Amino acid sequence: MTHHDLLILGAVSKDIIITPENVEHSIGGAVVYSAVALKHLGANILAVTKLNPEDRQALEVFDRHGVPYRFLESPTTTSIRNTYHTADRDRRTCEAIGMVAPFTLDDVPDDVTAEVYYLGGLMKGE
C-alpha cells in the first residue's frame, strides 16, 4: 500500500477558449491545476482522473510535470467551452459540452492511502 500527502480526484477537461481575437484549446480542470502546483511545491500526490481513452493524450500534462496519476476510462471526456465577450476577459459564457461518467467510491484506489482526499469536481454530476 502506498501513502500520499494528497489524493486528488477529478476530471481532466478539454477546454475551448474563445476570445474576440482567437480560439485556443487547452487542458484544464481542478485535478490538473492542483496536481501540477502541489507537485512543484514538493507534495507527495496522486491524481486520479477519468476520460475517454481516445483523449488519452490529454494526460501528457501530468507526464510533463512528473505528476503520478491513475487513469480511469469513461465513455466521454469533460469539455468546457468558455466564450469571452471582451478582450479583457471580464465577461464570459461557460458551456459544458461534455462530462465524464460520475465518480464513485469505487474509483478511489484501494491500494492507496492519503492524508487528504481532494475532490476536484468541475460540474454537478461528476
Per-range role (PLM):
Residues I8-V12, Y33-V36, D107:
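Short amphipathic alpha-helical segments, especially helix-boundary/capping motifs
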